[in-house]
Amino acid sequence: MARCAQGCDPPIVALRCAIVDDKPEFLEAARNLLERQGVAVVGLVSSAADAVERVQELAPDVTLVDVDLGGASGFELARRLPDTQVILISAYDEEDFAELVAESPAAGFLSKPQLSRRAISDLLSRR
């Protein structure tokens, strides 16, 4: 196999992602969608109580965190993950959470229908 000379594109590295959501059906749907787009989904977490420890163990490039975790706040979870790039997600539009998103340490916000590798990469590239 020939080696690449100067000017070659670097190999594409899969984006490593964890997803935190209290709805198992969304976790599976999001994993399937993102994996078809080349994202390596390294973990699915269904409770805020387990999220900090699991995300620290998994060390993903980005963690998608639902805003409403069934009694727990995705905004609070983002604060508890200072060494992790967090993107907040919700079935609702960003306008519903604009002030909270702006005040949070999260990299940004995506509505669940907008979820894609490209949307995630676009948010991360703005940081």
Task: Label each residue range with its predicted role.
Residues 24-43:
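Two-component/phosphorelay signaling modules centered on CheY-like receiver
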Residues 44-62:
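Acidic, metal-coordinating helix/loop segments flanking the phosphotransfer/catalytic sites
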